[in-house]
């Protein structure tokens, strides 16, 4: 009797001889129909290739919220950015809020982080089981995931930034809070800034400012894990030299007389001055966008202090190690 081939070998042999059906070869494959392939050098810089838009420079007047009904005023640049709105940058949405006395306004974005600065007025905040008062000059932060009700005891206006556009881009919902609602009272924030401004070497620093922090984010020293909020002063008759960073800055002007301005541009000359800058004249209550990577310097040609509040996505950028903040060196 001739020896039989082992069953396992027979099985492998049959498998090797099996051919793909010609009908299957011509059938569309759903798993690959979205696949694309691009030549590297023409695709590695989509901004340079004009496949994606640059962050536009823009300013927003305080007249947008000076009067009228209780409302949210989105500072919306989504058309220029080519993304769903409202969005002021690719990952952030800045807004003015107006809440008339006796009214309430509900905020419930799909966001991880929300920051408010109280421009004027007073009222209260309620998010889930947490409630606290607010008044002019306060900062406060709110996590996402729960609706927040802002009630005005006196007509209130606020500057409000969240990261909803980032979550829209990521396609994510169901936020898990990384921090609790947190208030930074005006008196404490102003005292912290005053202490920094009175230090002997303050005038030699690139900026005279304090960063709002939260104990949950010791690595980034930022107000939330995504957002950075800075409270800065530009003293009378002073210049704050150029610096740049890869985070977008959504700047709010909390105080300043005519004669205070910012110069913004993409390049420095050999002396550390901005080449062909755009000038932004400050007006109390306005906001403006400083695009990522742009050099910017502040000038105060008046005899009074001026105040600026930049809110950025620098919490996230710092954690990703991509902030790349640089300071001009001038003679």
Predicted features and spans:
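Double-stranded beta-helix
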Residues: 153-213, 224, 257-288, 301-331
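Conserved short histidine dyad/triad with adjacent acidic residue
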Residues: 75-83, 93-110, 230-246
């Amino acid at each position: 009797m001739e020896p039989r081939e082992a069953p396992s070998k027979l099985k492998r042999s049959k498998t090797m001889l099996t051919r793909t059906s010609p009908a299957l070869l011509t059938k569309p494959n759903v798993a690959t129909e979205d696949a694309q392939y691009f030549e590297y050098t023409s695709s590695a810089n989509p901004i340079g290739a004009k496949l994606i838009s640059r962050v536009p420079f823009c300013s927003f007047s305080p007249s947008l919220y000076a009067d009228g009904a209780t409302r949210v005023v989105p500072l919306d640049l989504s058309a220029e950015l080519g993304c769903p709105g409202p969005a002021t940058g690719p990952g952030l949405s800045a807004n003015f809020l107006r809440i008339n006395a006796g009214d309430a306004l509900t905020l419930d974005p799909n966001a991880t982080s929300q920051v408010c600065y109280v421009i004027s007025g007073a009222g209260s905040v309620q998010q889930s089981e947490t409630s606290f008062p607010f008044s002019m000059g306060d900062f406060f932060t709110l996590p996402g995931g729960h609706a927040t009700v802002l009630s005005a005891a006196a007509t209130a206006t606020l500057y409000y930034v969240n990261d909803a556009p980032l979550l829209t881009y990521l396609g994510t919902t169901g936020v898990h809070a990384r921090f609790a609602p947190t208030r930074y009272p005006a008196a404490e924030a102003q005292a912290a800034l005053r202490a920094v401004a009175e230090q002997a070497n303050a005038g030699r620093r690139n900026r005279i400012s304090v960063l709002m922090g939260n104990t949950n984010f010791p690595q980034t020293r930022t107000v939330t894990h995504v957002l950075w909020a800075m409270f800065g002063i530009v003293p009378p008759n002073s210049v704050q030299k150029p610096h740049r960073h890869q985070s977008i800055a959504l700047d709010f002007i909390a105080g300043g007389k005519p004669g205070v301005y910012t110069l913004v541009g993409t390049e420095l000359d050999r002396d550390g001055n901005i080449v062909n800058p755009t000038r932004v004249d400050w007006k109390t209550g306005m906001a403006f966008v400083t695009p990522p990577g742009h050099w910017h310097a502040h000038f105060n040609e008046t005899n009074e202090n001026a105040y600026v509040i930049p809110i950025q996505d620098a919490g996230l950028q710092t954690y990703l190690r991509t902030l790349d903040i640089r300071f001009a060196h001038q003679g």
